[in-house]
């Protein structure tokens, strides 16, 4: 969506990627709900970076590491929440921010008994260190 030779601008990109994502996630969520599996399945939608607050000269947005959007559903977490905010230019977090460590800790604490994971020798040490160092996103 940064509109270079290989990527469309925002309007075309949202049409090409946004609609199928919305349709697929909506159908998946509805299927999990109908099967009674939504509270046991945590879905997280994110990317590996955000996009610049301003549209560039080619009609797109470049990579931006200071801020990105996460969407959570299922897993027994609260619904209809907005957690955190950006500054008025949408360029940096305003107040506390959520790290990738917080995201990983949230997943692990939501889906597993973390005390039992600490006893499992097959769990990588780096993962255990992250779980011990970073707190889950409490507001969820």
Describe the residue ranges of each PLM region:
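Ligand-binding pockets and gating/stacking loops
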Residues: 1-140
């Amino acid at each position: 969506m940064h509109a270079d030779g290989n990527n469309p601008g925002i309007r075309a990109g949202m049409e090409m990627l946004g609609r199928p994502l919305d349709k697929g996630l909506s159908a998946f969520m509805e299927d999990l709900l109908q099967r009674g599996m939504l509270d046991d399945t945590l879905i997280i939608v994110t990317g590996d970076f955000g996009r610049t607050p301003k549209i560039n000269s080619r009609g797109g947005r470049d990579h931006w590491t200071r801020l990105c959007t996460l969407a959570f559903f299922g897993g027994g977490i609260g619904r209809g929440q907005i957690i955190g905010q950006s500054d008025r230019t949408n360029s940096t977090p305003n107040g506390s921010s959520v790290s990738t460590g917080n995201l990983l800790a949230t997943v692990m604490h939501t889906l597993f008994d973390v005390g039992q994971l600490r006893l499992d020798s097959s769990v990588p040490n780096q993962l255990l260190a992250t779980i011990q160092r970073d707190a889950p996103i409490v507001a969820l």
